[in-house]
Amino acid sequence: MVGVQSTRADATSEAINELKQQIQELDQKVKVLERQQELDTEAADAKAKDTPRITIGNNGLSAASADTNFVFQLHGVLQIDNRTFFNDRDSHNQSIVGNDTFLLRRARPIFSGTVYKDFDFMFVPDFGGSSVQIFDAYLNYRYAPWLQLRAGKFKVPVGLEQLQSDQYTSFNERGLPTALMPNRDIGFQLWGDVGNGRLSYAAGVFNGVGDARNTSNADFEDHREFAGRIFAQPFKGTSLMALQNLGFGLAGSWGNISSNATGLASSYLTDGQQSFFTYTNSSVVANGRHWRLSPQGYYYWGPFGLLGEYVISDQEVRKGAVKADLQNTAWQVAAGWVLTGEDASYTGVTPKHPFAPRDNHWGALQLVARYADLDIDNKAFPIFANPATSASEAKAWAVGLNWYLNKNIRANVSYSHTSFEGKMNPANATVTRQPEEVVFTRLQLAF
């Protein structure tokens, strides 16, 4: 009996020991699995830190490193236009230049990004014209929002509507004051935004370009042009909702130019992109000081928008032994109302309900109107310009309707009427012989 009990005790003890050993082995396996899981998690976290982030949406294509120190973005603007001229024959039944046409107004891929956190870049070619052009190509160092340095080819900080992105302008073509503004130039610019955007400034030195001109890649002048702009939005971010989008400023440029290579505009253009003023020939050249001054401002509140600017362009010119100081001026006022109630802004309209007819959504509609005037200095005639082919003043008014199907696609139609004043009756078959009447349409993709 005692032997049987002893045998049973030994068997129980052995079973307990085996169970303990199994528990220990199981515990060891659990620890190994837990450690493996920790290692897998650490590896996944490390991989996530090094994995680029790629996003595609209505703001284009973007790829960024996990720490966002390196960013590449692809955007684009495509504008397909039509111009239809009316009453484009004079009283002698002679054609007055204007051609009804479809055109690819802009076809611009926009490459931009950031390297090493503080260095931004932008490169913008345009395939919309008869030849490929480089419109923007610059590098920007961003020490802070209020202190940045830009170098390369970019817009000169003078014209308010000129500085507005092409995809956001109210009409197919910018107003008459743009004819007296510099366009793009090569140079250096110190700029920034102070107080969360309540004050912005820009001051730069450039090769120097004539009115409405882009720079070439080479400069034939020893002189430089200085340009600057200060723009305030004093109520931005405050509780005064009605004044948050009030902005006003002053811009200008000063330079000294002594050749026609960069000094004088080849011509001033109407809304329909027809020349209404030209200097007589290549013997008229820029010959000295050239300065511009432009007070400007805008106001947006709810669906209402208003933009206005005035510009003086003063240029010393010469034809042979004859010299003069010509001062041309221009101004414009443009207003808009979003009929569907969305907010208007300097950067366009975003529909509350993008176009989706199955859901009875139709996007946003905006009614726009503009009046503009450009006055040529009387001293330009008849020595520097021919009064038989060039007008001394152009007055233009326009109305239009913009349809924002969604944030990326927009269609618009507008009508423009430009009348001319001159020192004598225009010659037959010239643009200035009677008012220009033109209807524009556009289909735009911007992302």
Named regions from a protein language model:
Residues 40-54, 82-149, 158-166, 211-221, ...:
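Surface-exposed loop and membrane-interface regions of Gram-negative outer-membrane beta-barrel proteins
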Residues 76-84, 123-125, 151-153, 203-207, ...:
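Transmembrane beta-barrel strands of outer-membrane/channel proteins
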Residues 61-63, 76-78, 104, 109-113, ...:
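Residues on the lipid-exposed face of transmembrane beta-strands in outer-membrane beta-barrel proteins
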Residues 63-72, 118, 146, 158, ...:
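Short loop/turn motifs that connect adjacent beta-strands in outer-membrane beta-barrel proteins
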Residues 2-79, 86-90, 231, 339, ...:
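N-terminal periplasmic/intermembrane-space "pro-region" immediately following the signal or transit peptide
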Residues 90-95, 133, 144-231, 235-240, ...:
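Surface-exposed coil loops of outer-membrane beta-barrel proteins
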